[in-house]
C-alpha cells in the first residue's frame, strides 16, 4: 500500500497545515499517510473507498481522514478536491482542544463524511484561499494567523455540516443523500422521499442533477451498484443474493446494469479479474 509522507507535502518541517488542490482528482490507489487530512469536494463525482467502505462523493462532501485511515478514489468524473492537510493536534503552537470540532469515533463508528451546502462551500473556498496566501513565515504573528484560519475552517464546517441541521433546500438535499446511503436497498418512491425531506419533486430532481450530474434514479442505481461491488469483493454471498440485498428485484437486470456501469460482470469482480487495473 502506498504511504504518503508529510515531508513531501508540507512547506517546512514545522508548518502544521498545508493546502493540496486536486483539480481534478484522478482515480488513485489505496493509500494512507502520516498526517491528517480534510478532503473538501468542490464539484464532480466519484467513489471514495474509506477503510474498505465505499461512499459516493460529490460537491459539498467533506471527509475527515485520520493518520491511520486508508482510502482510495475510483470511478471519478471531473472530481475536483481541495485537501487541507494537518500534521497532528499537538503540532499547533496556539491551538488546543481541536478534537471537540472534529468527528469522533463512538462504538466503532466514525462519522467521516459530512456534507455542507453550496453557500458554505463558497465560504470554505474563501478561507482556503486566505490560508494559501498567508505565507510561510514562522514568526509568532504569522503562525498564529495561519492557525486562526484553520480554526475558523473547522468551526465553519462544524456549524454548517449536516450534523448541525439546516433548513435550506440544498441542505435538505444533503440530508436526503445521506438517507439514501443508509436506505439504498429499500424500494424508493421519489414522491414520498421528496415529501419526507420537504422538497418538491421538481426541486429534488433539479438539485440532485446539479450536485451529481445524475437523475435521482440513476444516482440510486449507481449507489446500489457500488454497494454490490463492495459485497462481491468482500463477502461470500451469491450474485443473486447480493442483487437482492442491494435493492435489485431481478439478478439478470442487475448483471446488465452492473456491466454497463463498470465494464465488468459481477462474476468478473467476484473472481478478481479487475484487480490488474485497480
Swiss-Prot record:
Paired cysteines (S-S): none
Keyword Transferase carried by entry: no
Keyword annotations: Activator, Cytoplasm, DNA-binding, Repeat, Rhamnose metabolism, Transcription, Transcription regulation
PROSITE patterns: HTH_ARAC_FAMILY_1, HTH_ARAC_FAMILY_2
Domain HTH araC/xylS-type as annotated: residue spans: 174-272
GO biological process: positive regulation of DNA-templated transcription; rhamnose metabolic process
Subcellular location: Cytoplasm
Top-level taxon: Bacteria
Annotation: DNA-binding region: 191-212, 239-262
Site for Interaction with sigma-70, residues: 241, 250
SUPFAM superfamilies from the UniProt entry: Homeodomain-like, Regulatory protein AraC
GO MF entry, a single one: sequence-specific DNA binding
Any GO CC annotation of this UniProt entry: cytoplasm
Residue ranges of coiled coil: none
Binding partners and assembly: Binds DNA as a dimer.
Xref: PANTHER family: HTH-TYPE TRANSCRIPTIONAL ACTIVATOR RHAS (PTHR46796:SF13), HTH-TYPE TRANSCRIPTIONAL ACTIVATOR RHAS-RELATED (PTHR46796)
Function per UniProt: Activates expression of the rhaBAD and rhaT operons.
Protein name: HTH-type transcriptional activator RhaS
Lineage: Bacteria, Pseudomonadati, Pseudomonadota, Gammaproteobacteria, Enterobacterales
Amino acid at each position: 500500500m502506498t504511504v504518503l509522507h508529510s515531508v513531501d507535502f508540507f512547506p517546512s518541517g514545522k508548518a502544521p497545515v498545508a493546502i493540496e488542490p486536486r483539480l481534478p482528482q484522478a482515480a488513485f490507489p489505496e493509500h494512507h499517510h502520516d498526517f491528517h487530512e480534510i478532503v473538501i469536494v468542490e464539484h464532480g463525482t466519484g467513489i471514495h473507498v474509506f477503510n474498505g467502505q465505499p461512499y459516493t462523493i460529490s460537491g459539498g462532501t467533506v471527509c475527515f481522514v485520520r493518520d491511520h485511515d486508508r482510502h482510495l478514489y475510483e470511478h471519478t468524473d471531473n472530481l475536483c478536491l481541495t485537501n487541507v492537510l494537518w500534521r497532528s493536534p499537538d503540532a499547533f503552537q496556539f491551538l488546543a482542544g481541536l478534537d471537540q470540532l472534529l468527528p469522533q469515533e463512538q462504538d466503532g463508528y466514525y462519522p467521516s463524511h459530512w456534507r455542507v451546502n453550496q453557500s458554505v462551500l463558497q465560504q470554505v473556498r474563501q478561507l482556503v484561499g486566505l490560508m494559501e496566501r498567508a505565507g510561510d513565515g514562522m514568526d509568532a504573528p504569522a503562525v498564529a494567523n495561519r492557525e486562526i484560519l484553520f480554526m475558523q475552517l473547522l468551526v465553519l464546517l462544524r456549524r454548517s455540516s449536516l450534523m448541525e441541521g439546516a433548513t435550506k433546500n440544498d441542505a435538505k438535499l444533503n440530508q436526503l443523500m445521506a438517507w439514501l446511503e443508509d436506505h439504498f436497498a429499500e424500494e424508493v418512491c421519489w414522491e414520498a422521499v421528496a415529501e419526507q425531506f420537504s422538497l418538491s419533486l421538481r426541486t429534488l430532481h433539479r438539485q440532485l442533477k446539479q450536485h451529481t450530474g445524475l437523475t435521482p434514479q440513476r444516482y440510486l442505481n449507481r449507489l446500489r451498484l457500488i454497494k454490490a461491488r463492495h459485497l462481491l469483493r468482500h463477502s461470500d454471498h451469491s450474485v443473486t443474493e447480493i442483487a437482492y440485498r442491494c435493492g435489485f428485484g431481478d439478478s439478470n437486470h442487475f448483471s446488465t446494469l452492473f456491466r454497463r456501469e463498470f465494464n465488468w460482470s459481477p462474476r468478473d469482480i467476484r473472481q478478481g479479474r479487475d484487480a490488474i487495473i485497480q
